[in-house]
Amino acid sequence: MNQLESLKQFTTIVADSGDIELIRHYTPQDTTTNPSLILKATSLSYYQNMLEDVLAYARKQSGNHNAKMRAASDKLAVNIGLEILKIIPGRISTEIDARFSFNSDMCINHAHKIVSLYQEQGINKSRVLIKLASTWEGIKAAEELEKAGINCNLTLIFSFAQARACAEANVYLISPFVGRIYDWYNQRKLLTEDSYDREDPGVKSVHKIYDYYKQHRYQTIVMGASFRKIDQILALAGCDYLTISPVLLEKLRSSYQHVERQLFPATKFFHKPIPLSESQFRWEHNQDAMAVDQLADGIRKFALDQYNIEKILAKKL
């Protein structure tokens, strides 16, 4: 049995890709997308006919050129999601515009728009996860969306405060970014040569979150994300979900080395603490320099990719 199949015994595998052929090849349960992946997908030949359909849809919408451009962007993300849903049994994660990350109302409104576009094509909201950045405003938006029956994937998790606030908001799933945590420490030469497996700071972060969730009986799913190497993935065998890029999925599929479970259900349980207030959340998150840097950087990068998607669409409208 290869490592990918072995890993599936302990963990739900999710593909981090917008490439239909690669997703079909690796048979994941779910798939995650983001503006970076959508931008990359616009250059794939598979999606060229879809682009024409998206532009035709946008031209029929009311409003000025900018409104039509935003409509095209939403429709593109949803249409890519629709194609992916044809070949996976589970859910697609579609991301809210990162520029709304500090406005709960705009996050909520955009989420309802995305869900409506899926529903217009016959897709039940139970097959869609709305991705939001894990700012305080994003978490509060997710809390309201969950109450409305719209499940959310809270992304760009770098601090324990973010993870705790998400659990306390009863969000469906969180995505701690293992590789980007590792990158921050590595770029500052804060790691030794043997900082791997459980000593990897990104891996350690997910272990801490996973154990805390299970010990306090939170139902929020932990999905490790943003991996840089196979060792990070194998060190999280047993995590609820792992979302993995096609390059690393192929490495797992090609290896037949033994996979040993590293994360286990809790054996000790504790009462849930009083939920964090906004000021407590902001203070605790602020105390983690890596998390502050990486959350801000992640939002900026996703916003830039969203802008570039709109730029491509605007030229064609």
Curated annotation (Swiss-Prot):
Family: Belongs to the transaldolase family. Type 1 subfamily.
Function text: Transaldolase is important for the balance of metabolites in the pentose-phosphate pathway.
Subunit composition and interactions: Homodimer.
Pathway named in the protein's UniProt entry: Carbohydrate degradation; pentose phosphate pathway; D-glyceraldehyde 3-phosphate and beta-D-fructose 6-phosphate from D-ribose 5-phosphate and D-xylulose 5-phosphate (non-oxidative stage): step 2/3
Gene: tal
The keyword Transferase is assigned to this record: yes
Annotated EC: 2.2.1.2
Catalytic activity: D-sedoheptulose 7-phosphate + D-glyceraldehyde 3-phosphate = D-erythrose 4-phosphate + beta-D-fructose 6-phosphate
Name this polypeptide is given: Transaldolase
Sorted UniProt keywords: Cytoplasm, Pentose shunt, Schiff base, Transferase
Location relative to the cell: Cytoplasm
Tree of life domain: Bacteria
